[in-house]
Structures are given as structure tokens and as C-alpha cells.
């Protein structure tokens, strides 16, 4: 099914028994996380806390959690019937990234039709008025504490805005970038924008600071957009395609957007809540000077307002280190009447990002096959923090093939530049079955010959196990059968029962009393 907005999606989930309304009072401080975590681990429904308590008082709006807490709900949000159907989404993205030469006139017309749908028919539709601007808070009315922002873990430095869809545009870009970056409230109208340097929003900001130094950088943050737009922001969309366009392809209709009240950025017209504002130059009267704790490194000299972010409990299952990030000053907050605050938590897998990773794994396979057609299957186990460990099965064709695949995976998509461990197995091994993977590792690997170690490679700065922040090692494990040139020994032959015997036993099975 396709969904016009978040409320349309929630209505469908409720009809399917996939949404639970909770009327008992529940605090946004810790209690909501504990409930959501228990329900997610049990494969339970999305949760709508209708009697949320925030800062020891009733919240002004309900809180939605665990929206994408199962792979099936992720698939539904992307317009698919089940997780397996997301392979088709991956095929579409692969074609948009690198179209193959047409095989004939009919195929050429089909490819032209697809590109037309992606690049023109699904360009966002701008509307003059929108539900997301029915209510406007400006000036002294801007107070972030009025939003029921969760405090997720006991050691968190502050509440954490975790599902904000951050919308930016670089100075030379025609398309807007949508990304999801966590944000730490600093006061009534300020949030720390934690984005990593390779992410789209950070790149847009870098380009703006270089092209227009000393000028405020406009940003909007949408909360509670329709599911296709939310999921488009976490999918590896080609740089030539807007996430709004991709959301339109998923939905089957153009994404409706409206111009922000204070900038030229376009926001999802049906979003529940929108924050508008800027990253301010450090010398702007509204900017606050950075406070450097004793013993801490000073902020980088960006020329913009910066603050020390964290610590927060993260998707790794640990509290992360503090680091400096730019500060987002909120000029106004717009929202629908009776808005819903969309929230989540991150913690030791499984959490909601880990579930998203399981579902999006199906999208990655066709993208990877376009670059490495020998790939049979690819798996990012959620317990590996969704991206730090990958298992890939291949149709091995020559000695050294597994090593080529390792380095290819580290290079093909930005999403895998932080993958620390890659295990390569043959096509007879199911990479999603640990019993088979471990069997292959223990019978087809020599620890010295078949281990590839790479030093001084890019690593997620949240990875405190690396010797230097942002830089560390990688390991590739070749658990494939070895070819001549890789070994001089006679290689083992796997044991298989005769098929005729298996059929005879199948026929007599019911008579055996087993």
C-alpha cells in the first residue's frame, strides 16, 4: 500500500494489529525507552503513548515509538508487501545509479520511462498551504522543552531528538539533501547538530561555509513525515536524485512539499512538526560562545557556533565520547493541529536502527551486484551494529577472488566505508546462517594465509576500540574453498547424502514412528 502521510500509515498499522495505543501515563525519561525496547525485542507493534508525561507534567502531544520496529513494517513503509520485495527497490536504485545499456528498442523505451518517472514525474510538488504550518511558534514561543523529547538512558547528558529529518541544500546544489542526524537540546531554541563529515548535510554545510563564509546556513528539521520520505532519507539514493523524488517513486505519487516560512528550503507538507532555523556564524549576536571543559580539546575553527555534544547511549550499546558539532538555532516551530511527536531510542542491538538495517540489507544486494556481479548474497548482522561486520557469499572464479571482493565492498558504497570485518564465503554457504558461516571459517580458513589486515583506514568515530578517533584497522576473512595457487594441498570434498537414498527415506518417513 501507499500512504499519504504518517497518520494514514498509522491507521493501516492499527487495522493490521501493528499499532498499540498506550493510555497509561508513561514518562519520556527512561520509562518510554524501557517499554519500547522490550516490545521491539519481542517483535511487537508500534507504540503510541497517548498519555506521555514530560518534565513531570502531561505532554502536549502523544509520542510515537517503534514505528519501524519490525522488518515487515519497514517494507510496508516503503510500499512493499514484504521484506523480500525490497530487492525490487534495490534493483531500481541500481538502475538509477548506473543504467545498463539497453538490449533493444523495447528495453530502451522502458529505461527512458523509468528515468522519466524518477527525474521528472516524481519531482516534488510544491503546494501553497500545508498541514505542517497550521500552528506556528515564533519568538518567545519557541521552546523546545514543550516537545516531549525522550531521555533514553541514565547516563545521557540531556534529552535526544532522534528522528528528525534534516533538510539542507549546498550553494551549488539544485537538489535538497535529507538526512537523519541526532540532535541535543541546549536550551529553549538551540540544538547540537551531530552529523559525520561524510554525510550529506555536513557536506552541504562545508560547501556553504567555503562559498559564503560568515553567512548563516539555513536548515529545517521535519518530524513525523510520511513513511516513504522518512525511509528515503536512510536509503542510499544516487547523488543525482533527491530523496523527495525517491519517496515519490516508493509512494507512487509526487511528494508534496511547502516552502519553509523563513528560508527557501522545502519541507514535507504533511509533516507533524517542523523546526526552522540556521547554523549561525560565531560572531552573530545570537550565537553563544563555546564552553571548553577543563582538559577537553577546543572546538575546530569553523567560524560557526559550536558546542560539545554527548555523551549519549548509542547504537553500539555504549555511551559515546564527546565531540564538537555545529549548533542549530531554531527560529520557529510549525506543526499540524494535534501533532504526533515521532521518537526512537538507540542502544545495544537490536534497536530500531538495527531493524532498519536488516530490511535495507535487501536493498543493498542489487546495488552491490551491479559493481560485483559475482555476489550471491550479502548480510549485515544486526548484532554487528548493522554495518561493522558483513558476510558475503560469492561465485568464486579464481585464486585471490575473495580479496578483490573485500576491497570492492570497502569502496563501492559510502555506507560500507566503516565496515570493520568482512567474511567472504562460497555460494554453498548461507551468509545469514551463523552455523554455516562458522563451519566455513573453521574448515576453509588458515588464520595466517586467509586473513587480510588493513591499517589506518576510515573508521566510525564512535568506535572507541580504534587506536585513533576516525582511523583504525579492518579485517577481511577469506572463508572460501581454496584454489590452486592459494594452497598446494588436496582440498576436502564436502559430504552429501545420495539423493536417491534421501527420496527413499522421505517415502518411508511416516512409517518410522519418528
Swiss-Prot record:
Residues bound to Mn(2+): 177, 243
EC class (word): lyase
An annotated GO BP: ubiquinone biosynthetic process
Entry binding sites for prenylated FMN: 180-182, 194-196, 199-200
Key words, A-Z: Cell membrane, Decarboxylase, Flavoprotein, FMN, Lyase, Manganese, Membrane, Metal-binding, Ubiquinone biosynthesis
Gene3D superfamilies (UniProt xref): Single helix bin (1.20.5.570), UbiD C-terminal domain-like (3.40.1670.10)
Record's catalysed reaction(s): a 4-hydroxy-3-(all-trans-polyprenyl)benzoate + H(+) = a 2-(all-trans-polyprenyl)phenol + CO2
Biological pathway: Cofactor biosynthesis; ubiquinone biosynthesis
A molecular-function term among this protein's GO annotations: 3-octaprenyl-4-hydroxybenzoate carboxy-lyase activity
GO cellular component: cytosol; plasma membrane
Membrane topology qualifier: Peripheral membrane protein
Cellular compartments annotated: Cell membrane
Co-factor note (free text): Binds 1 prenylated FMN per subunit.
Xref: InterPro entries: UbiD, UbiD-like_C, UbiD-like_N, UbiD_bacteria, UbiD_Rift_dom
Cofactor field: prenylated FMN; Mn(2+)
Pfam family, one: UbiD
Its EC number(s): 4.1.1.98
Complex and partners: Homohexamer.
NCBIfam families membership: PRK10922.1, UbiD family decarboxylase
Record's function text: Catalyzes the decarboxylation of 3-octaprenyl-4-hydroxy benzoate to 2-octaprenylphenol, an intermediate step in ubiquinone biosynthesis.
Family note: Belongs to the UbiD family.
Name of this protein: 3-octaprenyl-4-hydroxybenzoate carboxy-lyase
Origin species: Bordetella pertussis (strain Tohama I / ATCC BAA-589 / NCTC 13251)
Amino acid at each position: 500500500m501507499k500512504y499519504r502521510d504518517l497518520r494514514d500509515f498509522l491507521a493501516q498499522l492499527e487495522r493490521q494489529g501493528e499499532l498499540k495505543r498506550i493510555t497509561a501515563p508513561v514518562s519520556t525519561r527512561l520509562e518510554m525507552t524501557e517499554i519500547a525496547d522490550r516490545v521491539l525485542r519481542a517483535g511487537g507493534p508500534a507504540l503510541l503513548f497517548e498519555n506521555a508525561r514530560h518534565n513531570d507534567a502531561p505532554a502536549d502531544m502523544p509520542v510515537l515509538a517503534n514505528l519501524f520496529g519490525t522488518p515487515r513494517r519497514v517494507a510496508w513503509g516503503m510500499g512493499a508487501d514484504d521484506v523480500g520485495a525490497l530487492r525490487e527497490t534495490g534493483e531500481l536504485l541500481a538502475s538509477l545509479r548506473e543504467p545498463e545499456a539497453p538490449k533493444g528498442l523495447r528495453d530502451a523505451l522502458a529505461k527512458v520511462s523509468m528515468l522519466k518517472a524518477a527525474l521528472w514525474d516524481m519531482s516534488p510538488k510544491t503546494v501553497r498551504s500545508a498541514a505542517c504550518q497550521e500552528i506556528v511558534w515564533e519568538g518567545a514561543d519557541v521552546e523546545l522543552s514543550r516537545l516531549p523529547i525522550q531521555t533514553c538512558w541514565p547516563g545521557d547528558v540531556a534529552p535526544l531528538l532522534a528522528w528528525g529529518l534534516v533538510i539542507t541544500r549546498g550553494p551549488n546544489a539544485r537538489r535538497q539533501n535529507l538526512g537523519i542526524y541526532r540532535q541535543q537540546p541546549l536550551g529553549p531554541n538551540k540544538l547540537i547538530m551531530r552529523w559525520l563529515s561524510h554525510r550529506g548535510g555536513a557536506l552541504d554545510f562545508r560547501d556553504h561555509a567555503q562559498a559564503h563564509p560568515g553567512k548563516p546556513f539555513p536548515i529545517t528539521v521535519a518530524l513525523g513525515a510520511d513513511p516513504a520520505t522518512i525511509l528515503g532519507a536512510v536509503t542510499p539514493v544516487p547523488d543525482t536524485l533527491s530523496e523527495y523524488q525517491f519517496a515519490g517513486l516508493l509512494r507512487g505519487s509526487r511528494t508534496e512539499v511547502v516552502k519553509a516560512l523563513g528560508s527557501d528550503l522545502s519541507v514535507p507538507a504533511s509533516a507533524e512538526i517542523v523546526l526552522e532555523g540556521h547554523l549561525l556564524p560565531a560572531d552573530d549576536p545570537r550565537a553563544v560562545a563555546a564552553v571548553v571543559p577543563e582538559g577537553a580539546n577546543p572546538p575546530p575553527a569553523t567560524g560557526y557556533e559550536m558546542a560539545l555534544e554527548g555523551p549519549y547511549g548509542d547504537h553500539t550499546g555504549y555511551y559515546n565520547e564527546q565531540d564538537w558539532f555545529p549548533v542549530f538555532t531554531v527560529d520557529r516551530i510549525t506543526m499540524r493541529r494535534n501533532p504526533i511527536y515521532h521518537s526512537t531510542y538507540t542502544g545495544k542491538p537490536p534497536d530500531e536502527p538495527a531493524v532498519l538495517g536488516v530490511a535495507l540489507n535487501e536493498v543493498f544486494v542489487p546495488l552491490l551486484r551491479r559493481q560485483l556481479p559475482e555476489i550471491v548474497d550479502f548480510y549485515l548482522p544486526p548484532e554487528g551494529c548493522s554495518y561493522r561486520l558483513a558476510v558475503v557469499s560469492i561465485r568464486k572464479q579464481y585464486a585471490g577472488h575473495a580479496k578483490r571482493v573485500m576491497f570492492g565492498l570497502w569502496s563501492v558504497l559510502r555506507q560500507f566505508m566503516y565496515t570493520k570485518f568482512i567474511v567472504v564465503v562460497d555460494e554453498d554457504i548461507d551468509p545469514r546462517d551463523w552455523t554455516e558461516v562458522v563451519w566455513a571459517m573453521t574448515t576453509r580458513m588458515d588464520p595466517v594465509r586467509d586473513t587480510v589486515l588493513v591499517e589506518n583506514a576510515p573508521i566510525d568515530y564512535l568506535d572507541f576500540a580504534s587506536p585513533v578517533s576516525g582511523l583504525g584497522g579492518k579485517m577481511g576473512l577469506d572463508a572460501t574453498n581454496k584454489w590452486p595457487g592459494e594452497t598446494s594441498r588436496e582440498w576436502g570434498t564436502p559430504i552429501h547424502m545420495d539423493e536417491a537414498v534421501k527420496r527413499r527415506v522421505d517415502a518411508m518417513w511416516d512409517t518410522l514412528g519418528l
